[in-house]
Amino acid sequence: MVKIRLTRGGAKKRPFYQIIVTDSRNKRDGRNIERVGHYNPVAQGAESRVVLNVARVEHWVRNGAQLTDKVRSLLKEVSKTQATAS
């Protein structure tokens, strides 16, 4: 099964996550099919907290990919900010 989930990067006490499309059997930080965005939970100042390619996420969901709970909430957050910006 294909999943859209987070993979951790960054440094100790300073996490940074890539939002990736991967097979569910792969390790958390293992191989991925495509990178569709990133999430910085400790963003400060002008740094962006979430960057997500919504069109690619929708493409993968249409083709059967499952979202993890955190990615689903991030997608909702991005959609909300795009709606208010328009």
UniProtKB/Swiss-Prot annotation:
A single Gene Ontology CC term: cytoplasm
Keyword field: Ribonucleoprotein, Ribosomal protein
Example of a GO biological process term: translation
Gene Ontology MF annotations: structural constituent of ribosome
Segment forming the signal sequence: none
Domain of life: Bacteria
HAMAP family: Ribosomal_bS16
Family recorded in the similarity comment: Belongs to the bacterial ribosomal protein bS16 family.
Matches recorded under NCBIfam families: S16
Protein name in UniProt: Small ribosomal subunit protein bS16
Organism of derivation: Xylella fastidiosa (strain M12)
Gene name per UniProt: rpsP
